[in-house]
């Protein structure tokens, strides 16, 4: 039965950025019951100002100022918008009630009165990822069942945003056939009379506990510089101050804290060096090897178990927290050193905190070192820049990131993989990550196969394009690309892995997800951690590390079970690759900076790390912003220009030359 089917394409409701009201709005908050029109006898709906922080409603007017928590529904001039902001639970089991909460924004010039809410749920589970995404993007419809309809009971004044909450009993949910476990679409519509004003869609995941082979999930996270980070480090008249770098250090440290089961952190050693990770900071953060492998050492090891990171080794030389987060546990001072003045909640050595985060990450999970400045291996190969590429690998091998324990075993392609690039990789790079969607399967399969294969002696990971987009907070279909809300991104990750698991429940497969370099800087680490947790803790998934993927690739070869994929092409040049002209311009800037600073006792104090302009121009992250790459080389000259502008010749006394030649003393300040 489908009593109501409302179809509206309100594209703005899918992209739901968090906004705060600048002007104060007032509203009366009340708890209202649904109208008798709903068959759900114990269903509840509440409507209250979005600014309220407690579930209890106040009858008096309250205001929503700019300093309050941001609301979710987007205020659009002349329109009414609705946003589903939370589900409780997000993964539902049989017999559970469902609570849907959200916000409604009145961007019109008149009060909204006589409003009603309608909630519909899909009758069956989506069977394909493409169908799931098209439905969520409101590009296609499906059979829906109305599970709630009721009046809101209050008006919403112009410029006001109000929250709503609807609780639907388990008996009203179309969740009967346990074989239909997995994602179900939810659609919430706000109407006035017969006119639908706006609607929003999200996903609920039904977990019946059905037996299925878990999907083994591996997620790759780039801990690399963004284009804006490289611009900060390289351009401008003055090098960035430590205050300028504070946010960048915090962001990188927060990414390192994501280390754990099923997560692979791919780190750029050049970025960590630019942020102050040195031999000294690594030595200070590395656990002391003093507990020797003798029976008497067991008690010391037991004491060291109190370190903040459960899977990391003890931290004997530092007692403060690893990042600018709340202070660490008391009494964790190590046996080999006394606390330094910086070991305080206001750690005055941010480079030490960042180094500690690196060391703890290496102990907690898979951390690999990328070539210096995350060099675009394919682009440099296509340009014949063998020396620059070799230098990138050499500098990584000599870096403190590798000294801390990160191997150089992984190469992460920024574009399509080709044979020329494979041949250019060093022997140490025995695992290759392709761009999402590269090397597609060329067999007719009814399920998504493991996203790991092999080419020659190398393990090749082929990340899932849909899941990789969702991890970055984007819904990409054949027709559109839309930013996802936090709820939708998390639910889409759960939903798509559930669909993939259901396709072949008797067959456990490996799922590889890669966060795009361009997305890494734009996703809050806390939000990213929640998405990783959703992938790790679903009953149909389990985390998996690099070692298991390598073993699976070897087993495929030995057993002849490797799925046939497209052959690796000989040569593929991407449109966004760095050009020979851009590298030439970068080299000209480097030479200019070198000539300007050659007379200075400490060039780095004057220009910072701008001398890395060539290496940074070759970074893979610039594929997302080729124009920015082209302008960086010219902008980097500002450092040299600032130096020459401060040079003056100091006046001296007259010198009479009697000989035909002489050495003249010149002092430059």
Task: Name these PLM-found stretches.
Residues 1-41:
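Secretory targeting and sorting signals
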Residues 29-73, 77, 110, 411, ...:
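C-terminal region of N-terminal signal peptides and the immediate post-cleavage residues
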Residues 67-82, 637-646:
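Proline/serine/threonine-rich low-complexity linkers at boundaries of modular beta-sandwich domains
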Residues 103-109, 667-669:
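Asparagine-centered strand-capping/turn motif at beta-strand->loop junctions
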Residues 126-153, 648:
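Short beta-strand and strand-turn-strand segments in soluble, beta-rich domains
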Residues 172-186:
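Short glycine/proline/serine/threonine-rich loop/turn segments at secondary-structure transition edges
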Residues 197-359:
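Active-site beta->alpha N-cap acidic-glycine motif
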Residues 243-246, 257, 263, 394-406, ...:
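Catalytic grooves of carbohydrate-active enzymes
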């Amino acid at each position: 039965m489908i009593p109501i089917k409302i179809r509206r394409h309100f594209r703005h409701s899918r992209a739901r950025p968090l906004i705060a009201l600048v002007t104060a709005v007032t509203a009366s908050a009340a708890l209202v019951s649904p109208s008798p029109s709903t068959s759900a006898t114990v269903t509840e709906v509440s409507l209250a100002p979005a600014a309220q922080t407690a579930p209890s409603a106040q009858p008096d007017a309250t205001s929503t100022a700019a300093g309050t928590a941001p609301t979710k529904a987007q205020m659009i001039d002349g329109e009414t918008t609705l946003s589903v902001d939370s589900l409780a639970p997000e993964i539902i089991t049989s017999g559970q009630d469902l609570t849907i909460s959200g916000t409604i924004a009145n961007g019109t010039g008149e009060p909204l009165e006589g409003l009603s809410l309608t909630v519909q749920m899909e009758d069956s589970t989506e069977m394909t990822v493409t169908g799931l995404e098209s439905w969520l993007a409101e590009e296609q419809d499906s059979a829906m069942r109305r599970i709630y309809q009721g009046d809101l009971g209050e008006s919403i004044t112009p410029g006001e945003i109000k929250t709503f909450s609807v609780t639907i009993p388990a008996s009203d949910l179309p969740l009967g056939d346990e074989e239909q476990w997995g994602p179900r679409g939810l659609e919430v519509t706000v109407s006035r009379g017969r006119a639908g004003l706006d609607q929003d869609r999200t996903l609920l995941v039904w977990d019946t506990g059905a037996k299925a082979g878990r999907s083994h999930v591996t997620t790759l996270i780039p801990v690399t510089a963004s284009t804006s980070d490289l611009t900060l480090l390289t351009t401008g008249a003055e090098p960035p101050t430590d205050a300028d770098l504070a946010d960048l250090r915090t962001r990188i440290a927060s990414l390192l804290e994501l280390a754990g089961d099923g997560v692979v952190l791919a780190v750029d050693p050049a970025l960590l060096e630019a942020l102050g990770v040195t031999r000294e900071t690594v030595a200070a953060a590395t656990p002391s090897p003093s507990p020797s492998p003798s029976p008497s050492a067991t008690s010391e090891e037991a004491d060291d178990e109190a370190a903040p990171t459960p899977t990391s080794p003890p931290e004997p030389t530092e007692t403060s927290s690893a990042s600018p987060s709340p202070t660490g546990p008391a009494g964790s001072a190590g046996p080999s050193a006394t606390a330094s003045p910086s070991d305080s909640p206001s750690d005055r050595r941010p480079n030490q905190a960042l180094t500690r985060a690196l060391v703890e990450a290496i102990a907690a999970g898979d951390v690999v070192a990328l070539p210096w400045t995350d060099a675009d291996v394919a682009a440099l190969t296509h340009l014949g820049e063998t020396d620059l590429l070799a230098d990138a690998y050499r500098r990584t091998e000599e870096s403190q990131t590798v000294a801390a324990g990160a191997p150089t075993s992984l190469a992460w392609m920024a574009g399509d993989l080709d044979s020329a690039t494979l041949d250019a990789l060093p022997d140490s790079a025995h695992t290759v990550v392709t761009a999402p969607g590269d090397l597609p399967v060329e067999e007719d399969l009814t399920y998504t196969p493991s996203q790991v294969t092999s080419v020659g002696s190398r393990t090749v990971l082929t990340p899932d394009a849909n899941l990789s987009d969702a991890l970055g907070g984007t819904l990409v279909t054949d027709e559109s690309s839309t930013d996802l809300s936090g709820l939708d991104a998390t639910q889409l990750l759960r939903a798509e892995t559930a669909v993939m698991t259901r396709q072949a429940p008797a067959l456990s497969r490996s799922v590889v997800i890669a966060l795009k370099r361009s997305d890494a800087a734009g996703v809050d680490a806390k939000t990213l951690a929640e998405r990783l947790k959703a992938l790790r803790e679903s009953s149909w998934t389990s985390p998996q590390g690099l070692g298991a993927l390598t073993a699976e690739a070897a087993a495929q070869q030995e057993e002849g079970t490797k799925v046939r994929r497209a052959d690796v092409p000989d040569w593929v040049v991407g449109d966004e690759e760095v050009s020979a002209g851009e590298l030439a311009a970068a080299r000209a800037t480097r030479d200019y900076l070198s000539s300007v600073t050659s007379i200075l006792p400490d060039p780095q104090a004057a220009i910072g790390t701008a001398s890395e302009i060539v290496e940074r121009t070759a970074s893979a992250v610039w594929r997302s912003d080729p124009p920015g790459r082209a302008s960086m080389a010219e902008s980097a000259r500002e450092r040299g220009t600032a130096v020459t502008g401060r040079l003056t010749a100091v006046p001296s006394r007259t010198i009479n030359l009697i000989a035909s030649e002489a050495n003249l003393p010149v002092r430059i300040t």
